[in-house]
């Protein structure tokens, strides 16, 4: 059953059962004091409402029959997946730079199996959800995301998570180039950096690459669909 979501710059219509809700990198690294972003000097003090809004969006999406995909950004314990000096990631990843500048943190940031890598306690994947590791900002790079989506006939992606201006925007942009329709729920995302980074990312998305809505509007759009499915 199709539903129409009020969004910027215009409404978008989609079938929830052919749509995925993507939760980007809601790990301690990005959303919890003492995690990577916090240790690297980024403000994570306002992430709690984002976590609550993601919980709300996930519940509504699951009720409507949407696929839920959780991303976790990071690398193996030896950081082979992060790339060496021949990779731009080695030079631009703030996690890698922070560990080089603070040797006591070596091996603690974004390493698989670490507290930093884990999803925040409030967000727990359920049976039927898909959890994907990713080694770079985009969720399409070196992951099976495209295959997973195409095999299920999914063409619409609803994005939540951190950071709006880095991994969320990178994944949505790559999806745009692969012919996916991307929507960001702005109050279920958070930027890395000053507030203007959030505004700039949302401007780019709604102007060039996708659509922007919010959690309440998303839930309202799905509610009639869910009732119709139950009936």
From Swiss-Prot:
Family named by the database record: Belongs to the isochorismatase family. RutB subfamily.
KW Zinc-finger (keyword) present: no
Organism: Escherichia coli O18:K1:H7 (strain IHE3034 / ExPEC)
UniProt xrefs under PANTHER family: ISOCHORISMATASE-LIKE DOMAIN-CONTAINING PROTEIN (PTHR43540:SF6), PEROXYUREIDOACRYLATE/UREIDOACRYLATE AMIDOHYDROLASE-RELATED (PTHR43540)
Stated name of the protein: Ureidoacrylate amidohydrolase RutB
Function of the molecule: Hydrolyzes ureidoacrylate to form aminoacrylate and carbamate. The carbamate hydrolyzes spontaneously, thereby releasing one of the nitrogen atoms of the pyrimidine ring as ammonia and one of its carbon atoms as CO2.
Catalytic reaction(s) noted: (Z)-3-ureidoacrylate + H2O + H(+) = (Z)-3-aminoacrylate + NH4(+) + CO2; (Z)-3-ureidoacrylate + H2O = (Z)-3-aminoacrylate + carbamate + H(+); (Z)-2-methylureidoacrylate + H2O + H(+) = (Z)-2-methylaminoacrylate + NH4(+) + CO2
Pfam families from the UniProt entry: Isochorismatase (PF00857)
């Amino acid at each position: 059953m199709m539903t129409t979501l009020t969004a910027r710059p215009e409404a978008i219509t989609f079938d929830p059962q052919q749509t995925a809700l993507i939760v980007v990198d809601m790990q301690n690294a990005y959303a919890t004091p003492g995690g990577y972003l916090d240790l690297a000097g980024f403000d994570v003090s306002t992430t709690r409402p984002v976590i609550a809004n993601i919980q709300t969006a996930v519940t509504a999406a699951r009720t409507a029959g949407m696929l839920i995909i959780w991303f976790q950004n990071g690398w193996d314990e030896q950081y082979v997946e992060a790339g060496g000096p021949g990779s731009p990631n080695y030079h631009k990843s703030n996690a890698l730079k922070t560990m080089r500048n603070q040797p006591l943190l070596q091996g603690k940031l974004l390493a698989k199996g670490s507290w930093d890598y884990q999803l925040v306690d409030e967000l727990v994947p359920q049976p039927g959800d898909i959890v994907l590791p990713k080694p770079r900002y985009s969720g399409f790079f070196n992951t099976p995301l495209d295959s997973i989506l195409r095999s299920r006939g999914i063409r619409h992606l609803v994005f939540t998570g951190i950071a709006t201006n880095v991994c969320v925007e990178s994944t949505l942009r790559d999806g745009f180039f692969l012919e996916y329709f991307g929507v960001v729920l702005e109050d279920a995302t958070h930027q890395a950096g000053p507030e203007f980074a959030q505004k700039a990312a949302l401007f780019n998305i709604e102007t060039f690459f996708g659509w922007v809505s919010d959690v309440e509007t998303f839930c309202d759009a799905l509610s009639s669909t869910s009732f119709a499915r139950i009936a």
